[in-house]
């Protein structure tokens, strides 16, 4: 059955190579990958890092987004790990000091909205050098994170607003929807890879086209520390 196939695939990839999901359900494969006895855990939080080519300007740029694949509704500690994983990938892609936007519906902290509170905490942690290797700001609405026009119109002062390299979503639903919107509406080149595992793991959608799977493979190779 699929559960046994997933276990065998996990055991096999420990010998070398990359684990690429085929027609098996994502939940089934992730359960094997995350198994505490024989899975691919390293002790780090595992997260999915999505990379796309932003083509809105004359010169396209790579932008990362996380986590739309593993962590359902991360708390502050998990969000910090997700950020560190994404920053690690950004460094591998040549982005020396990535600008990280913590996304929410608004750019102000609302005591009734958990994601804005978490964003405020994490932004302060970055200012106090508790999170390094990047510049973090949030909460930021999506337009404020990626559009300098929106930033100017709203009068926002931020080292990240309008030029984010990494977008951190508050939960898996937001990330999954955002990723699929880029793929199906914008038709942007995309790819993604799991970070925090003993071996590279690619959780591609069963509906992904061959070019997306190729991008995922290239990304996993680039992010490999072998």
Predicted regions and their residues:
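Anion-binding alpha/beta catalytic cores of soluble intermediary-metabolism enzymes, centered on
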Residues: 1-160, 164-226
């Amino acid at each position: 059955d699929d559960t046994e196939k997933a276990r065998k695939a996990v055991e096999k990839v420990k010998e070398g190579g990359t684990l690429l999901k085929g027609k098996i359900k994502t939940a089934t494969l992730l359960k094997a990958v995350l198994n505490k006895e024989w899975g691919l855990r390293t002790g780090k939080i595992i997260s999915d890092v999505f990379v796309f080519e932003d083509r809105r300007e004359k010169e396209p740029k790579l932008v990362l987004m996380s986590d739309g694949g593993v962590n359902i509704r991360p708390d502050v500690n998990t969000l910090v790990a997700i950020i560190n994983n994404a920053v690690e990938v950004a460094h591998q892609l040549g982005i020396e000091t990535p600008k990280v936007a913590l996304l929410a519906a608004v750019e102000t902290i609302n005591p009734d909205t958990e994601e804005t509170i978490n964003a405020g905490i994490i932004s302060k942690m970055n200012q106090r050098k508790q999170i390094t290797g990047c510049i973090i700001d949030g909460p930021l609405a999506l337009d404020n994170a990626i559009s300098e026009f929106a930033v100017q119109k709203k009068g926002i002062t931020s080292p990240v607003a309008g030029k984010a390299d990494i977008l951190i979503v508050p939960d898996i639903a937001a990330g999954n929807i955002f990723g699929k919107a880029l793929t199906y509406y914008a038709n942007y080149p995309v790819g993604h890879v799991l970070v925090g595992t003993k071996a590279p793991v690619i959780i591609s959608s069963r509906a992904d086209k061959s070019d997306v799977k190729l991008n995922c493979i290239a990304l996993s190779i680039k992010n490999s520390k072998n």
